């Protein structure tokens, strides 16, 4: 240092020694360091030894004059001199060639420099306070470096007693803790025995605070390595003003407060649904784009939202966490358990506004509402058939037996399957259908959970929606073939219907009434097809007892007659009259299309007429006697002339089934006169069901195609049959029973 060299030159001259306070104190500091090194028996620092040797003469000259007065000051600051030497040692550990890390030399600190603990002599120089404050500052930096070194400890290449390990218990904690990586490199170790004399005894006690051992640095890393000012900031300083909940970030508090205020600033531009968070809106938009970016790693199934995927992953767990307290069933999802618990009660909160039917789940109500959307009619198209009801003299029991639109047990689809078959379904077939319904329900129920309500209608197409898509893509050519096949299928079922009529006499129907979703005493959960047959009582009237409106009069014609008698002279000629079917049009000449209106009190008498024991009347072709009126057109009849029952049954929601096409000779009345007379009244449940929605062109007087029209109008050789359509699809089941739920 310049001060040291100047002091040595002045003292080496041998002249009068000028007492200088600062050089003398530095000389005393260096002398004390040399004495401590000699007491331990090791060598001092090379720089310190050089400086001690260079200033030896000045030390001797200065100590002769005023050595006693300066020994007292040296004893006071011996502790601080030891600390300063320790700081110099730490600075020498890093070495001058590699620049020290910037984090080890940060001047900004969360600690305030502490004034020296010893009392300062009054009137002393201010340099003493500056040196003391600098020593405290360096002490703080040294503690930071020691804490950083303790945090970066790793197992060095040397053993426990190798050269890379510092003296135990002095700098880096216990003896088993290895040194930091930068102390175990090649070359002489800076912590070796000859590198630095660690002060023993009182010097070590002065280096560390009282009460803490030399291994205290490992506990100071968290507090010393924090950024300035972080220790004073609270961990959660953002508090909700509604519920006093604390948050670490202001954005989290903002989102939380929106749950109290119900603020939803992010809305979907497609459906208008609003959300509190922007990421929720982003996940929602995947529903409209039909993208499923979140894939399950187990089964590969895709989901629109990440939280839905998280719920799905529970399905792959070996153990079901949610268990029913009533029947001990377990479920992977809590929403499924909640739905299952409703089966143990009669709570059905969702009610249909059209028919009053109640459901346990909202998704079941939505699916049921689609049946009303198919059969909706305007108020102007409503046909009141109250007079017809009075003519039938219905009893109170029959009026209470309602015909539900979606009741599969009484639906004509059920009777259609029975009339074409030879007997009841076997028990194994019924169990197979039950298991299939349970599997279909599991697939559809997976999308109905509490986490994603908007996804349950717009996700994958359900199994129950497939027949509806069939209707949308129905081709006109397929429809024409289906109509042709329908007529032949009806004619072919005549023999089966007559064979069943003998066996049905004397039997009494059981379990009459509607199949509600889960009424008291019932056995099914919701709209579930049942395998039981409903047979009519022997006392019920047959086809001949049906009231005939005055507009349609049937009378007998001799078998040899060429055709029906002509109409009165004043009657207008019927338009679109088909030669082969002269009895199929009403008096006004327009084809009658039934109104989609449901009567719920005419079910049991009308749908089972084919099973009564009354023989059919003689096969005579009926004709229509028109009643000409010049003032107004004739009124619309209450039921279709080509139906054996009122047309209200046409409003029952039905899916068009493609039936196998017959050969043409079955439809030709010339080849089979018995089938061409009045076979349409022998199975009215089939005929009224299929003819009410879309009457075939053969029955409306319109030729379905060139080949079929020519075959029915002229006598000639039979033409090749149209291509055979695929077999009919099974009846649509839209519900599941409690037995299926318990069996899953």
Curated annotation (Swiss-Prot):
Gene Ontology CC annotation, any one: nucleus
Biased composition (Acidic residues): 391-403, 442-458, 468-482
Ranges of compositional bias, category Low complexity: 1-10, 492-504
UniProt effect for mutating residue 284 to Y: In bowl2; embryonic lethal. Legs containing clones show fusion and truncation of tarsomeres and disrupted expression of the leg patterning genes bab2, dac and B-H1
Stretch list, region Disordered: 1-24, 38-77, 391-593, 608-648, 686-744
Disulfide bonding pattern of the chain: none
UniProt keywords, alphabetically: Developmental protein, Metal-binding, Nucleus, Pair-rule protein, Phosphoprotein, Repeat, Transcription, Transcription regulation, Zinc, Zinc-finger
Known role: Putative transcription factor. Required for leg joint formation, acting downstream of Notch to pattern the leg tarsal segments. Functions in the terminal pathway during embryogenesis, acting downstream of tll in the posterior of the embryo. Acts in a hierarchy downstream of drm and lin during foregut and hindgut patterning and morphogenesis. Involved in cell rearrangement during elongation of the embryonic hindgut. Regulates expression of hindgut patterning genes to establish the small intestine region of the embryonic hindgut.
Protein name: Protein bowel
Lineage summary: Eukaryota, Metazoa, Ecdysozoa, Arthropoda, Hexapoda
